[in-house]
Every structure is written in structure tokens, then in C-alpha cells.
Amino acid sequence: MAFTGKRLKGLIAATFTPMTPNSDINLLVIEQYVDYLVQKQHIRNIFVNGTTGEGMSLSICERKRLTEEWVKHARGKMDNVIVHVGCLGLSDSKDLAAHAASCGADAISAVCPSFLKPANLDALVLYLKDVASAAPSLPFYYYHIPKLTGITYQIYELLGKVKENIPSFRGVKFSDVNLMDFSLCVSEYKEFDCLYGVDEQLLGALAFGAHGAVGSTYNYLGNKNGDMLEAFEAGNLQKARKIQCSLQEFLYFVFDMAHFSGSKAN
């Protein structure tokens, strides 16, 4: 049975982790960062400590401190703070999940272990169930990013297995170019939120019914992507295509600079 409650939709910025010149996390600028996203980019949802936030390269302590600051400063200004809690070890993931719940996060998400990988889909479901159980009151989203994890199971098949096994399961952050798999998820599992994570081809995912999108570029291209969403929803596909193409031209330059460092420089 799907987790009941509010649905995630629209643009969700995958936040960068601010750093000092000494490579320490810079908590002092997070309030300003939140205000910038809300006031300048019209973003009201964030995904923290994920790939863009370099969460897998941070210590557990650093991730907890970041979660606390993001939740504190987003309260009353944003609609949702989704905290990525995935780690290479199950106990750390559960620790972060419980901590996110205690801080007042709105949802959690997790990639699966990518060093010693789940042997099959059933093993992956058991892992996700264990992580989600540490924060049973929070909606849980699986973070699918096969380019980095090497986990290439079809998400369409995964959703069929989690449906009756993880009560708090709410959907998937789908960061892959396989639009056939994505489309099947959207059409067959309407109770779940299917959030697309490849910014440069968002329009294609919208055509297949994406409920929302999570991405790094919404930190600085939130308004432009918002315009594209509005054009698409209004049925003005020509305008939506024009905006998507202009975004792609810009992102081609940004990604050529080295994806995350280039984006962070913006």
C-alpha cells in the first residue's frame, strides 16, 4: 500500500554543500542559500546531501549538521526538505534516517550500497525496507542513479515489489536516461511520485508524465525551468521546446567545465 500524504511535484533543487576555503562545511551561509532559492529562483523544495551535495564524501557528523541547518532555515519558507540518507553501510543509513525524522525533515531518500551491491531485486527491496523502517513516519524515495551506483535493475519491476513491502514508500528519484522504464513507472504505478533527475532532458520526461524533477541546475536555472513547465502545462510545446534547447546549450558549456565544480561555480 502506498504511503498517504502530500505529493511531491514541480522543481526540487538538489542543493550544493557550501564549503570554506579549508574544505569545512560552511553552515553560516545556508540561511542565505535558502532565501536565494525561494526569492530568486522560486524554488520551494530541496533535496539535500545527495550527489550534488557530495553527501557520500561527507562524514556522518557533517551530514547530520547539514540536515539540521537546512531543515531549520527552510521551515516556514519552503514546502519540503528531502534528506538523502544513503550510505555504503546499512547502520549509517538507518542512523541518518532516524536523525532526519528527529530534525523534522519532510521525507528521506537513499541510494543502495554500490560497493557490495545487492545481488538481486529482492535483496535491494530488503535493504530499502530496513532503511525506511528507521523513519517510518517519513515518506521514502528510492534514489536510482545507475551511472554512479552500477545498479541497473528496472525500476518498473522494483516498484511492483516495494508496493506491499515498504509501507512508507512514496516514489523514486529517477536519475537515468531510460525513458521507457520511467514511462512504465508513471503509467503503471500512479500512487507513487516519479521524480526525474536528468535536468537536460526534463521535457522528455514531462511528456511521459513526470510528477516533478530533482536536479542540481534548478539552483541557478529554476526560473527558466519553471517557465518551461508552465509552457508545457499550457500546451505550448513549441515554447517549451525552445526553452529546453536553450537550457541544453547553456548546460553543455557548464558540464564541459566539469559537471559539479562547474555548476557550483555558477
Curated annotation (Swiss-Prot):
Its EC number is 4.1.3.3. GO terms for molecular function: N-acetylneuraminate lyase activity. The active site is at Y143, K173. Pathway: Amino-sugar metabolism; N-acetylneuraminate degradation. It comes from the Eukaryota. Keywords: Carbohydrate metabolism, Cytoplasm, Lyase, Schiff base. It is found in: Cytoplasm. InterPro entries: Aldolase_TIM, DapA-like. The keyword Repeat does not apply. Coiled coil: none annotated. It catalyses: aceneuramate = aldehydo-N-acetyl-D-mannosamine + pyruvate. GO terms for biological process: N-acetylneuraminate catabolic process. Its main location: cytoplasm. Homotetramer. Belongs to the DapA family. NanA subfamily. This is N-acetylneuraminate lyase B. It comes from Xenopus laevis (African clawed frog).
